[in-house]
Amino acid sequence: MTPTNPRTPASATASVPVRTPVHLDLRQDVALLTAALIDINSVSGNEGVLADAVEHALRQVPQLELVRDGDSIIARTNLGRPERVILAGHLDTVPLPTTEGSLGTVPAYWPSGAPGEGILYGRGATDMKGGVAVQLALAATMFDGGAEPGKDVTFVFYDHEEVEAEKSGLGRLVRNHGSLLGGDFAILLEPTDGTVEGGCNGTSRFEVTTNGEAAHSARAWMGSNAIHAAAPILARLAAYEPQTVTVDGLDYRESLNAVKIHGGTAGNVIPDRCVVEINYRFAPDKTPDGAEAVVRELLDGFDVVRTDSAAGARPGLNHPAAASFVAAVGAEPKPKYGWTDVARFSELGIPAVNFGPGDALLAHKDNEHVEADAIRECLRALRTWLSA
C-alpha cells in the first residue's frame, strides 16, 4: 500500500502524487550538510522539497516538538529551562544565476576536489544554507550522550524570505503560531562572517510630489516646470547630514537619499508633475512614525507621502542572554545597517542579533560561496554557548 502524505487530504491521494522526502544526514560534517542543502534547489516559491526533507529529518529527534505551516517549520525543546533561545533561518534562495560558467548554482561544487575541504560554491552557500545547516546539526546532536542544552531552544525554518514581505513564512508563523515563538533572545543565522551584528536599521520609503503646468517647451513661459520645482527637495536632501545614533552601545549610521525621480511626458512638453522617491534608513531608536516626522520636517512645505515602512530592531545586547552570547563568540559586536528579520522578533519584544557563517557581500552573487571552516566555527560557537 502506498503511504499517504500526512499533508495531503485522504480524498486527494488518488490524484496527487506522493512526494518522498529527500534524506538528510544531520550528523554528517556540517559543511557536507550545507552542500546537501544546496543540492536541493529551493528558490523562493519552491521550498517544498527542502521543507519536506527538513521536517522528515527533525522528526527523528524525539526531544523536539514540531509544527509545520506550509513550508515553514517550528521545532522546540520543552525542558523547562528558565531561558528560551530562538535560532531562525530561511530555506529559500534567490533565483539561480543565468551567467554561463557561474559557480554559485546547483548542485554544490568543491573546487578542491575533496568534499568538505576549502571553499564551497553554490546558490545559498552564504545566504543562508550554511546557517540552516548549523541549525539542523545543533538540533540533531544537542542531546547526544545524554547531554541536554542549558537553555530551551526553538528552531525556526521558514519560506519566502527573499521576496515581498507579505509572503514571508516567518510573518505567517507569527500570525498563526505566535504562542510558539516566545523567547528571551533570538539569533538569525544570516551571514555575518562570524561576527555578532546587533539589531538592524529601519527603512521607510516616501514620495514627494511637485506640480506645475504643462506647456509647449518653445513657449515655456506659458507653463510651470514641475521638475524645476523639485530642485529644493534635492538640495535639502543633499545638504542633510545623516545622524549616527548610539543604541545599546552600537553606532547605527543613518542615511536619507533620493533614490528615484520621474516626471515629464515628452521632450517638447513642460512637465506638469514630478515625483521624487526617497529612502530613509533610520536607527532603531526611532519608530516609523518618528522617521516620517524627520522627513516631513526636512521637507516642510512639500507633499510627502509614506509608501512603505519597516521598523528597525534594537540589539538588546544588555539582556543577559545576549551578553553571554557575545562573550562566548568572543568578537566585538557590530551594528546591522540593512534590514533583516530580526526586526520581526523585535516587534514581539524579543532582543535579536544576526550571527552566521559567510560573507554577506557574497550573497546573491553569481559565484556565491562560503568557507567550510567558517560553517564549522559557527557551529562550534553556538554549541558551546547552548551547552553552558
Descriptions of predicted regions:
Residues 2-5, 16-18, 25, 191, ...:
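Metal-dependent amide/peptide-bond hydrolase catalytic core
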Residues 2-97, 273-279, 294-297, 372-376, ...:
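N-terminal helical capping/dimerization or prosegment-like subdomains
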Residues 66, 73, 153, 302, ...:
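Hydrophobic anchor at the start of a short beta-strand
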Residues 72, 159-163, 263-264:
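Short, internal active-site loops enriched in acidic
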Residues 81-83, 115-117, 149-153, 180-184, ...:
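Short coil/turn connectors at secondary-structure junctions
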Residues 128, 132-201, 248:
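Acidic/histidine-rich catalytic neighborhood of metal-dependent amide-processing enzymes
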